[in-house]
A protein has these predicted regions:
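N-terminal Rossmann NAD(P)H-binding glycine-rich loop of SDR-like oxidoreductase domains
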Residues: 1-23
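SDR active-site strand-loop-helix element
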Residues: 6, 49-53, 88-93, 127-129
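Conserved Rossmann-fold NAD(P)-dependent oxidoreductase catalytic core, especially the SDR/UDP-sugar
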Residues: 73-108, 117-120, 124-125
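A structural micro-motif
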Residues: 1, 25-26, 86, 122
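Conserved glycine-rich Rossmann-like NAD(P)H-binding loop of the short-chain dehydrogenase/reductase
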Residues: 25-34
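Conserved beta-strand positions in the Rossmann-like core of class I SAM-dependent methyltransferases
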Residues: 4, 28, 125
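Rossmann-fold NAD(P)-dependent oxidoreductase module
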Residues: 15, 19, 78, 112
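NAD(P)H-binding glycine-rich loop region in Rossmannoid oxidoreductase-like domains
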Residues: 35-74, 78-80, 94-98
Length: 131
């Protein structure tokens, strides 16, 4: 199985990649160094997507939405364009219920994948992590 991991250089991403590789899975890393233009080719090679990438300390609060909701939108659009169902696990935050820019951006990302699942039948899983 080929697993695309966004946020692959983060704490969870690095450890998840090690674990998945130990289980014999092939991992595809997507980091801040990648561009969204690379996503379609990476997704084309994927059987499962673990979307961990997110912004939590931007210089400008607008970057919360650009990264947290924008990248999620790009992933969903790329999967839709392929015409095949690729399960997506979205790492969200318990702060998705908070009234702040970070929480709103995480909630927006959740709503994007839920709408994507509703529109396409593509499996989506959301994990609200603490912190």
């Amino acid at each position: 199985m080929n697993v695309l991991v966004t946020g692959a250089n983060g704490f969870i991403g690095k450890n998840l990649i090690v674990h998945l590789n130990e289980l014999g899975m092939h991992t595809i890393a997507y980091t801040r160094e990648n561009s969204t233009q690379e996503l379609p080719d990476l997704i084309k090679k994927s059987d499962f997507i673990v979307h961990l990438a997110g912004e939590n300390r931007p210089k400008d609060e607008k970057d919360f939405n650009t990264v947290n909701a924008g990248l999620t939108t790009s992933i969903c659009k790329s999967v839709r364009a392929l015409g095949k169902k690729i399960p997506i696990l979205l790492a969200s935050s318990i702060q998705a219920t908070f009234d702040n820019a970070y929480g709103k951006s995480k909630l927006d990302a959740e709503l994007i994948v839920k709408r994507f699942e509703s529109d396409t039948g593509n499996p989506v899983y959301i994990c609200r992590l603490p912190g």
